[in-house]
């Protein structure tokens, strides 16, 4: 039975103020940095900012980024749509594994994906536009497969059958009937893929060349190399406006899609014809190969030298003489990343959990929960630059405290925590709270009786998800990190900037560890989510 919001009279006083802590956190670490960034644009250096906006260089980079993002989106759709059709509609042995594999690229840190493709393709494909597009399409396969597949799975195929009966070819039925019914999902997934590709940083830095740049990489160059903060602010402003426009256009296009009544159906058996059956199974097998090939190449690179198999790269992880004397040992980077992930998980779980709880309480809490989703539309470079301008210089310089990175990571993870926790609270039968209150329980005890069990599970799951986000985040950490305490993604990038196979091997070993840590946290989220789904409902136990 669906959840119902507790009545206002049954809500304990403290629960009515759960929105205050998330509002304060978002105000200080999201609104304030963005405001500082805006003030920088409009301040005395505004002339420099206006000059940057009017310069041809910023629009040349924008054109390159748009072209790259459009091409990446087209390739992701080209590969992702057949996979969405197969894993969401047909029943076959290994389907669950295929569906899980499709998700793997999306949860991998972008730095790991870039290194995996360098290990897989070597010098066969030169660094530049093509390699960046392939990597972006790989990362975003799950976006297309999940979003489009969820809608495709609900179509029975009756309309297509009617079209075939009337003489339409299989391709014609797909173009005239199936595609229009999937338009909203395709547009939504395309908008997300475009934004991710347009604002990419790690993949562009590792796989791109001087002709392959994004506004994100341009902001990094302006702040760390040119020390041109007004120019970086102008670039961040352009990126923020373009991303907002794309998401808005995607939402508008989705709403304008023709509505069609659909009949939810279960998985269908494989096609009876030999050729269609082989096509479905071949698509699933090809998808598995596409996903596993880069990861396998990364694993091989961690145990392979130019002429033999070796474990030297793994043995070098704890040594400061593995080409990283100036930067510290790779194992120290692992400790740093784990510490940041733990702090991120704690802060994001508390802030996001309180914001999600505020959703079920009538009042202004729902506005705060809506505000908590805003960081999804702010790029890492914009967030990192704003945070650096707000808290990275006197009179409030927090760089030496080591708190800027976990706070920025928590800000990025809060929307995901809300997305995990809020549905769980909504699905809880709120009448149990009223029953407990009627039996004499204190309002706080009544709330914990009704929502405590599910809240405990979803908070743990969302904390693990926030930790996974922190482990792989590269953009904000690049702006806010200290040279003496790099995270694992930053350490990987620095290793790859050094010549020699030892640096590449150690980077590959470090990337494998990062993959394992990330997947463990994702599996924790999945296990907790499965456990919550198996819990009996209140109505069922009554």
Question: Where are the language model's segments positioned?
Answer:
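Short, Lys/Arg-rich, polar N-terminal cytosolic tail immediately upstream
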Residues: 1-13
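Membrane-water interface segments at the C-terminal ends of transmembrane alpha-helices
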Residues: 11-45, 54-153, 181-208, 234-250, ...
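Membrane-interface capping segments at transmembrane-helix boundaries
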Residues: 157, 252-258, 428-430, 523-537
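Glycine-rich helix-loop "coupling/hinge" segments at transmembrane-helix boundaries
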Residues: 201-227, 306-309, 474-504, 537-541
């Amino acid at each position: 039975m669906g959840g119902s919001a507790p009545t206002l009279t049954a809500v304990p006083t403290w629960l009515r103020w759960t929105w205050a802590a998330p509002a304060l956190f978002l105000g200080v670490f999201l609104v304030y940095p963005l405001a500082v960034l805006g003030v920088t644009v409009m301040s005395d250096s505004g002339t420099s900012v206006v000059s940057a906006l009017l310069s041809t260089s910023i629009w040349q980079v924008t054109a390159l980024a748009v072209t790259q993002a459009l091409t990446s989106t087209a390739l992701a759709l080209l590969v992702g749509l057949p996979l969405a059709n197969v894993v969401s509609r047909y029943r076959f042995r290994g389907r669950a594994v295929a569906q899980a594999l499709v998700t793997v690229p999306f949860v991998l840190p972008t730095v790991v994906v870039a290194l995996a493709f360098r290990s897989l393709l070597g010098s066969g494909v030169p660094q530049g536009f093509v390699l960046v597009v392939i990597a972006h399409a790989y990362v975003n396969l799950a976006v297309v497969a999940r979003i489009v597949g969820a809608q495709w799975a609900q179509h029975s195929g009756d309309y297509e059958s009617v079209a075939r009966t009337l003489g339409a070819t299989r391709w014609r039925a797909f173009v005239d009937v199936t595609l229009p019914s999937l338009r909203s999902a395709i547009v939504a997934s395309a908008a997300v893929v475009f934004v991710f590709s347009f604002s990419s940083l790690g993949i562009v830095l590792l796989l791109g060349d001087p002709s392959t740049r994004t506004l994100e990489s341009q902001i990094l160059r302006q702040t760390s190399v040119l020390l041109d903060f007004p120019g970086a602010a102008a670039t961040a402003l352009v990126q923020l406006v373009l991303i907002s426009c794309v998401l808005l256009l995607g939402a508008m296009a989705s709403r304008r899609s023709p509505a069609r009544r659909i009949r939810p159906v279960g998985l269908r058996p494989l096609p009876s014809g030999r050729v269609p059956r082989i096509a479905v199974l071949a698509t699933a097998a090809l998808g598995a190969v596409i996903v596993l090939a880069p990861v396998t190449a990364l694993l091989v690179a961690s145990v392979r030298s130019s002429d033999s198999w070796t474990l030297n790269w793994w043995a070098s992880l704890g040594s400061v003489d593995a080409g990283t004397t100036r930067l510290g040992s790779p194992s120290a980077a692992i400790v740093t990343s784990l510490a940041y992930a733990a702090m991120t998980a704690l802060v994001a779980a508390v802030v996001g959990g309180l914001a999600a709880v505020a959703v079920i309480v009538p009042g202004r809490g729902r506005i705060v929960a809506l505000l908590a989703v805003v960081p999804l539309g702010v790029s890492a470079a914009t967030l990192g630059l704003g945070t650096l301008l707000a808290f990275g210089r006197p009179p409030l310089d927090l760089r030496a405290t080591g708190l800027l990175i976990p706070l920025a990571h928590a800000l990025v993870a809060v929307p995901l925590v809300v997305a995990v926790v809020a549905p769980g609270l909504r699905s809880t039968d709120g009448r149990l709270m009223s029953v407990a209150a009627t039996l004499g329980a204190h309002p706080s005890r009544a709330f914990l009786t009704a929502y405590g069990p599910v809240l405990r599970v979803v908070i743990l799951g969302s904390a693990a998800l926030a930790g996974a986000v922190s482990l792989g985040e590269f953009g904000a950490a690049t702006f806010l990190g200290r040279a003496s305490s790099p995270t694992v993604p930053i350490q990987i990038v620095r290793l790859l900037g050094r010549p020699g196979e030892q640096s590449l091997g150690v980077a590959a070993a470090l990337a494998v560890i990062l993959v394992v840590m990330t997947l463990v946290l994702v599996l924790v989220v999945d296990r907790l989510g499965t456990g919550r789904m198996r819990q009996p409902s209140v109505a069922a136990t009554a």
